[in-house]
Structures are given as C-alpha cells and as structure tokens.
Amino acid sequence: RLLEAIRTLNMEKEVRFYQASTSEMFGQSPPPQSEETLFQPRSPYAAAKLYSYWITRNYREAYNLFACNGILFNHESPLRGETFVTRKITMAIADIYHGKKKKFWIGNLDAKRDWGHAKDYVEGMWKIINYRKPEDFVLATGKSFSVRDFCEIAFKEIGINLKWKGRGLREKGYNRKNNKVLIEVDKRYFRPTEVDFLQGNASKAKRLLKWKPKIEFHDLVSEMVKNDIDNFKNQ
C-alpha cells in the first residue's frame, strides 16, 4: 500500500522507500548467502517477506521508485524481544545468576546464524536509503555461530564453563565445575522446518556503501548478558 501510495501521488522523486528483508528468505541455500543467492523460504514469515522483497523490486523497476531492500542477517541488542532465542538465553542466565532458576530449556543447539549488533545494521540501513540509486543489499558480519556457541559464551560472562553430554533430545549442558545441569533440549522449541546455516556475504555493501560491522559477536553477547543481569536488579 505504501508503494502504491507513492506511485499514485506522483511522489517518486520525493520519497525513498526502504523494505526490511530478512536472511530467513534464503532458507536452505548453502552459505555464504549474497544478493545473488537463490531464495528458499521455509516458514510463513520468510515467504511473506519474500513477497515484500519482490513487490519492492517490481515497483522500482516498473515505476522508477526509489525502493530498495535491505536483506539483513540476524541483528541483536539488549532491546531484542523476549521471545527470540538470544534473549531467552541471556534472560535465563540472568535468572540463574540471581538464583531465580536453576536451568532452562532450548531447541536446536546446532542451528547456525550470522549474528551482528543492531547498531551496526541501523547504520547500514541509513547508508542503503542514502545511496545514489536504489539497490538491494545484504548486511551481515560474514561469521556464523551456533546456538550452542551463544550459550557457551553467555555463560562465561557469569564465570561458568559449559560441558555437553548426550545427543539429540537427550543432550544437556552442565556446569563444568559442579556438574549441575543448566541447559536441556526440548522438542517443543524446534521449528517444523529448520533453517540450519545462515552466513552472509556483505561484500557489495562493503564495496559500494563502505559499510562494515564494528561490534564483534563476543562483545554483543557480553552486552546482552550484562544488561539482563542489571535489569533483574532493577525489577
């Protein structure tokens, strides 16, 4: 509707339109995924986002609108919604740190994502919308980590080293020091159609927009854990 409004009001030269696309559109396409990678959406969310991607391109090509897609890989911050896996982990660790809970449950430990910081990606979005012409860009760090990696790094922020025992649904994460169970796997948190491995290639954005992420994955995880620990204190 926004694109059609721009067209019917003859505002093509006055309005720049940015569509927030997602790396989930790539689905099972092998990494690294770039602007040229085949889309294979594996969820209703990804399919809907793919429609938005193509309608944006269509209006750009058909009506000469300044309409562009930013295909953003996972970007996190302490403001991430509480239903997302990264925030579930950091909030659970804050609860464990403060003695509110002893363990938590999680889904696929081996799903790999290209996680960056929202601050870097907002800067990238600004660069996309201010580029000299409308184009589509992938924004990504080029590095991929598993949910398991995220858990291990996050627990180290409270002085706990994890070790893993078991396989599949029976796998558990233990405190290496006292052998207490901290993480269990629950099939309820698995996706019906999982996306196993996302890792972006943002070379186009680096070349044309002079954009590159500044905040490393470990620093991102550390910031999120510390923020949730502090939030717990303030409750």
Residue ranges and their predicted role:
Residues R1-S77, K119, M125, I129, ...:
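N-terminal Rossmann-like NAD(P)+-binding domain of SDR-like oxidoreductases, especially those catalyzing
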Residues E82-Q235:
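C-terminal substrate-binding subdomain of Rossmann-fold SDR/epimerase-dehydratase oxidoreductases
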